[in-house]
Amino acid sequence: MVFLLCFFLVADVSYGINGDCELPKVVGPCRAGFRRYYYNSSSKRCEKFIYGGCRGNANNFHTLEECEKVCGVRSRDSPKEN
């Protein structure tokens, strides 16, 4: 069991970004107007969008911090590595 857990953790790190983060932004057909964040694979950043409230996908986060954590994006405020 521990071996499997280690394997999946290494595999996740090795292959980079969570697959859900590669999904396109989906606003959805409803009109609720929730502020959400998604990972933009072109800019390699989490960005704000307005979510309609239904028929979205997993690339839809309540906070910028949650998006950055799940998608492996460093915060804009963290110091750059040399």
UniProtKB/Swiss-Prot annotation:
CDD domains: Kunitz_actitoxin-like
Propeptide cleavage-removed residue intervals: 76-82
Keyword terms: Disulfide bond, Ion channel impairing toxin, Nematocyst, Potassium channel impairing toxin, Protease inhibitor, Secreted, Serine protease inhibitor, Signal, Toxin, Voltage-gated potassium channel impairing toxin
BPTI/Kunitz inhibitor domain span: 21-71
PROSITE patterns membership: BPTI_KUNITZ_1, BPTI_KUNITZ_2
Entry annotated with the keyword Secreted: yes
Compartment list: Secreted; Nematocyst
Cysteines joined through disulfide linkages: C21-C71, C30-C54, C46-C67
Keyword Signal recorded: yes
Record Gene3D superfamilies: Pancreatic trypsin inhibitor Kunitz domain (4.10.410.10)
Annotated site residues (Reactive bond for trypsin) in this chain: R31, A32
Family affiliation: Belongs to the venom Kunitz-type family. Sea anemone type 2 potassium channel toxin subfamily.
General function of this protein: Serine protease inhibitor that inhibits both tissue and plasma kallikreins. Has hemolytic activity. Inhibits voltage-gated potassium channels (Kv).
Descriptive protein name: U-actitoxin-Avd3i
